[in-house]
Amino acid sequence: MFDLTGKHVCYVADCGGIALETSKVLMTKNIAKLAILQSLENPQAIAQLQSIKPSTQIFFWTYDVTMAREEMKKYFDEVMVQMDYIDVLINGATLCDENNIDATINTNLTGMMNTVATVLPHMDRKMGGSGGLIVNVTSVIGLDPSPVFCAYSASKFGVIGFTRSLADPLYYSQNGVAVMAVCCGPTRVFVDRELKAFLEYG
């Protein structure tokens, strides 16, 4: 099992329950630093996380995962000043809006790919990094499509394809960065939304 003791973790998150609950677990793993990058600040959640492990340093940055690549590079240069290095990158930003296909694809797929492309050089052993782990959070709908969430499903299929490509042993042998996907099941909020959309469609 991957030992997180003393590690520096960067979590690109949305504002949902999965991100908060995952962060709570991370805070029990003796990590040294946790950077949380998401669109909205939540001081109460940060305080709750800090209470779990006061010795872990938590940093928060407001982050737009859809920003241009060049802007993203400058952004992470500032993040690295505080983090020094990144051992684990978690890409958890997600959006489900069938009425806004561009935003859904840009958040779930393009933004995630740009984030990986921006952070990977900081982790790459050939470029002075220490290697590590990238976790791309996707969905079971990326494995088995949903008839009422076509754009969301397509974006999550893309995440799995991108992740499987980067997870090839050839890459790991050169950069020391393992890549994996976590396919989350339905949450109550998502199920309620899917049922409502299905009934409206019917």
Curated annotation (Swiss-Prot):
Source organism superkingdom: Eukaryota
Keywords: Oxidoreductase
Entry GO MF terms: oxidoreductase activity
Keyword Flavoprotein: no
A Pfam family this chain is assigned to: adh_short
InterPro entries: ADH-rel, NAD(P)-bd_dom_sf, Sc_DH/Rdtase_CS, SDR_fam
Annotated catalytic residues: 152 (proton acceptor)
GO annotations of cellular component type: cytoplasm
Designated name of the protein: Alcohol dehydrogenase-related 31 kDa protein
Organism of derivation: Drosophila erecta
